[in-house]
Amino acid sequence: MNKDLTVGSPSKVLWQFCLPMFGSILFQQLYNIADSLVAGKLIGENALAAVGNSYEITLIFLAFSFGCNIGGSVIVSRYFGAKDYNTMKTAVTTALIGTVVLCGALMAVGLLGCRSLLVLIRTPAELMADSAEYLDIYTLGLPFLFLYNVATGVFTALGDSRTPFLFLAGSSTANIAVDVLFVAAFDLGVAGVAWATFLCQGVSCVLSLWVVARRVRAVPSEGERVWFSWKMLGQIAVVAIPSILQQSFVSVGNIIIQSVVNSFGASVIAGFAAATKLNNVLISSLTTLGSGISNYASQNLGAGKNERVRAGFGAGVKLLGSICLCFTALYLLAGRQLLMLFMNSPTGEAINTGLTFLQTIAPFYLLLAFKLTSDGLMRGCGMMGRFMATTLSDLFLRVVLAILFSSWLGVNGIWLSWPVGWFVGTVLSMVFYRTSIHRQAEEKTTL
């Protein structure tokens, strides 16, 4: 079902639209969490460390797929909000075609270069074989990942956040079962974890594309259908490329931080891997909700309702802030119990590493509600330069401080770089929001 985000109470509209997206990303995170859970519990600590070590590299591919998602989604939602349905359909097919070409190039790079990258980040010898095998299988599944993300972007652009939720709920649940089957019954080791994700993402991708095709065909339009447009691809790229660069820089920064963590040994890597999975449940959820806020802003911008864009800030902060507070309480009160899901011992270096990481960063989660709401509104309004500036400042500080603090304070110094980077990025994002979107809407209201 398509939803018009340009009418109704901004708070109610955003909550109704974004909550299914929140459910979707929770199930999306089950893919990676299930891999680590099964690896840690059924194979061993080194397997957990190998999957976690590989995960930081897979984030580069996820950065490109997220960029394709947000680029297509923002442009499709803009034409949907403007009721220009024929051009909207051109945007959908152009996004899909462009994504296929990009994905093919990335598959070649991944299959040829991932092992070299594992060496570059100082992967311990005992983790190398499993890490490389996991990455090779993951790379083969990139078409499923990319096309599924574009399909999800189309759904959210049309105001439908429920359908992606249903797909992810089914495929994520199946992934857990297939993970256990391949590892416990077939004894495939880390490769079994990767093949389970490959299979379940493939089924989800095919089904989502089929539903998208039916949904887009059902939208009434007039005139000749254009399947691919270079001009449209350029519009999508204007939004997608900054998002790809932003996410890629974040991924590269995380890889640099991972290389610092790797110097402390397999147990620290395992603890960091488990804690990162938990942290990424929140970060990925907030990022996805931020893209929902972008769609809200883009539809209203297309409809000429700038004042509703400004009203979305308060609604977005309340939504994201409530989620941040829940996760802060959860990780501070039950961090050890959650980390135990990945490990077999309640004590030891691995679990203590993960617990210290969570206890250091969780109290600062609320900062992200303000930053990602502002970022989402700026991205939806096409202010990509400002959006990138806030993220890169955060990333730069995190990487530099992780290196410096680790040399002064040891491994625990690495974790301090997160709250410092978040604080600076949030301040910049709020300043940019106040001097752009907020001021424009305020001036329009007073005319």
In which residue ranges do the predicted regions lie?
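Small-residue-rich hydrophobic transmembrane alpha-helices
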Residues: L48-A108, L145-P164, G271-G335, L368-G382, ...
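Short runs within selected transmembrane alpha-helices of multi-pass transporters and secretion channels
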Residues: N69, Y138-T156, P164-N175, V193-S208, ...
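N-terminal transmembrane alpha-helices
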Residues: L5-L42, E56-G71, I75, V100-M107, ...
